[in-house]
């Protein structure tokens, strides 16, 4: 009955848009699992529609799908997507802030599988334990390991084809406004966007 109320309705989303965002962050418990399956199934079906069209699938907070408390079927779905998306003219971008959770389910099987199927990896500042966990998977040197545990905001290590390079990421003001999570900056943006009172 709960599932009927949540999922058996007309959508208010235009599913033929160039960009489609499926936000399941407000779902919890069993609804989160069902929501993940519905979202992944939809995204995968869309990706397979046209092999000649380029497409990208972004999975933010990927640890929720492959972490310790995740559903193995959801984790298998994400791993299958990572392994096969390129064959459909697509790319998969997985983002997480917690690499420990990324490697928590089934001794890291899903996290390692996703990383091993990723051509490019971008690492921001990591805690020492997280850095050590990823060191073997990405073949990081001791110097690189030390570097990623001391990165300042905007610093990253890009790893592709077993080549690693430290970079400084600079964004435009517009990009910064689109991606910031800083509360002060968000409040400032909201204040600027609010209609002026006369």
Regions found by a protein language model. Give the residues of each.
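P-loop NTPase motor domains
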Residues: 1-90, 108, 147, 151, ...
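Polar low-complexity intrinsically disordered regions
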Residues: 2-3, 113, 169, 196-198
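Short acidic, S/G/P-rich loop/turn micro-motifs used as interaction or catalytic elements
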Residues: 27-29, 64-66, 99-101, 129, ...
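Short acidic, gly/pro-rich beta-turn/loop elements at beta-sheet edges
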Residues: 32, 168, 179
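Conserved ATP-driven motor cores of ASCE-family P-loop NTPases powering translocation/secretion/packaging/pilus
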Residues: 69, 73-75, 79-172
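Short, surface-exposed linear segments at secondary-structure transitions and domain or protein termini
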Residues: 174-185
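Acidic, low-complexity intrinsically disordered tails
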Residues: 186-198
């Amino acid at each position: 009955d709960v599932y009927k109320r949540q999922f058996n309705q007309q959508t208010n989303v235009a599913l033929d848009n160039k960009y489609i965002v499926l936000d399941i962050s407000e779902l919890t418990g069993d609804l989160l699992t069902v929501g993940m399956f519905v979202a992944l199934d939809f995204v995968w079906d869309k990706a397979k529609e046209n092999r000649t069209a380029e497409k990208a699938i972004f999975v933010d907070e990927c640890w929720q799908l492959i972490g310790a408390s995740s559903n193995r079927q959801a984790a298998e779905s994400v791993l299958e997507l990572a392994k096969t998306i390129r064959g459909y003219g697509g790319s998969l971008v997985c983002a997480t802030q917690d690499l420990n959770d990324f490697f928590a389910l089934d001794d890291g099987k899903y996290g390692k599988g996703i990383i091993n199927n990723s051509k490019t990896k971008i690492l921001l500042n990591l805690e020492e334990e997280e850095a050590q966990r990823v060191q073997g998977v990405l073949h990081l040197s001791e110097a690189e390991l030390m570097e990623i545990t001391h990165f300042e905001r905007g610093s990253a290590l890009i790893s592709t084809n077993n080549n690693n390079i430290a970079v400084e990421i600079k964004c435009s003001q517009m990009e910064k406004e689109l991606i910031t999570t800083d509360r002060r900056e968000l409040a400032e943006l909201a204040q600027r966007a609010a209609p002026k009172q006369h």
